[in-house]
């Protein structure tokens, strides 16, 4: 696997933050870049990052598998991590995970058939007093996520995704219409049917 010029430039920016003999310190940043661009970090990408940083492939794999923020396989548009660590367990963390899985019809680590949601149990998210807590797409922390708030969140995310998808289809249809109209006009000009 080879990375694009822009990806390599982003890697170089991260590597430059460390002394040359410690460029392996940029491994997490490089993996985050790969995931941002590809949606997950494949074994092939791990090997390519290892080669770029001069590391053993197993060392990169250890990082990828240790942190659950790295997706080792494709995930849904919305990745939902529900904390199930002991303090959250004591404050309904497992019930929250069970509720989301039941509502979406998936098992933990599973994705919905339409590819919109992936649900994962999570280790500590650092907000034990706010349990149950959830992290959406490794970026947005949500607290006090009881069943009603979970349902509201799932409905909102699903509606946003459907709206975005619908707008994309309308845009694609419009672009196709414009393309066909331009093509017809060119053909008419070539055939001398238009001025």
Protein language model features and the residues they cover:
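Feature of Fe-S/electron-transfer and energy-metabolism proteins
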Residues: 1-125, 129-130, 134-195
